[in-house]
Amino acid sequence: MGMSSLKLLKFVLFFFNLIFWFCGCCILGLGIYLLIHSKFGVLFHNLPSLTLGNVLVIVGSVIMVVAFLGCMGSIKENKCLLMSFFVLLLIILLAEVTLAILLFVYEQKLKEYVAEGLTESIQRYNSDNSTKAAWDSIQSFLQCCGVNGTSDWTSGPPASCPKGSAVKGCYIQAKQWFHSNFLYIGITTICVCVIQVLGMSFALTLNCQIDKTSQVLGL
């Protein structure tokens, strides 16, 4: 009974982490794609490296490393690797909770920073090709104009702005897009946390099962 339970846990944890690893590869690939094709980072000169592409590259790389530890720990029945996998998942989970709390506490300051960064970047529209490309992409995608409206463009709105008198600013449109997709973002976040907790549970259970099997076999 002990050996069959051990084998079952091994393969469950292995395939769990294999899927986890492939997800990490996809996230890493998407991050690299955004780094190559996206210019949104130039809109914020204070934190030019804090872009979605960079974040996805870091997240994808971390997921791949953690999943690799989980795969190797389960197949090799290595308690050290399993506990490393458990600790890393716990650290990631705590970091996510901390980030969520910080975003909630400093939500207003974050909004002000984003609005100020976008307003400053408008002044570089005609002098910086990267900034111009980023603004054109945002305005075309969100069907918006400027930060708060067409009045932000002192020399007249660019061609990427949609035509019409009731055009909204990109800051408002971005907030509306986030609010309209909040349910999907929340469900995705909860699913990620549940997967992490399951991974930690599998790792601890397998670790305990290895101990029990070793005692039965007299190892």
UniProtKB/Swiss-Prot annotation:
Residues 1-11, 70-80, 207-219 are cytoplasmic. One of its GO terms (biological process) is positive regulation of myoblast fusion. Pfam families: Tetraspanin. Its main location: membrane. It is a multi-pass membrane protein. Glycans are attached at N129, N148. Interacts with SCIMP. Interacts with CD45/PTPRC. Interacts with IL7R. Interacts with RBL2 and PPP2CA. It comes from the Eukaryota. One of its GO terms (molecular function) is protein-membrane adaptor activity. Belongs to the tetraspanin (TM4SF) family. Residues 33-54, 107-181 are extracellular. Keywords: Cell junction, Cell membrane, Glycoprotein, Membrane, Synapse, Transmembrane, Transmembrane helix. The chain crosses the membrane at residues 12-32, 55-69, 81-106, 182-206. Structural component of specialized membrane microdomains known as tetraspanin-enriched microdomains (TERMs), which act as platforms for receptor clustering and signaling. Participates thereby in diverse biological functions such as cell signal transduction, adhesion, migration and protein trafficking. Plays a role in the activation of monocytes and B-cells. Acts as an essential regulator of B-cell development by promoting interleukin-7 receptor/IL7R signaling. Also promotes, in B-cells, the BCR signaling by recruiting PKC to the plasma membrane in order to phosphorylate its substrates. InterPro entries: Tetraspanin/Peripherin, Tetraspanin_animals, Tetraspanin_CS, Tetraspanin_EC2_sf. It is found in: Cell membrane; Cell junction; Membrane; Synapse. GO terms for cellular component: cell-cell junction; immunological synapse; plasma membrane; synapse. PROSITE patterns: TM4_1. This is Leukocyte surface antigen CD53.
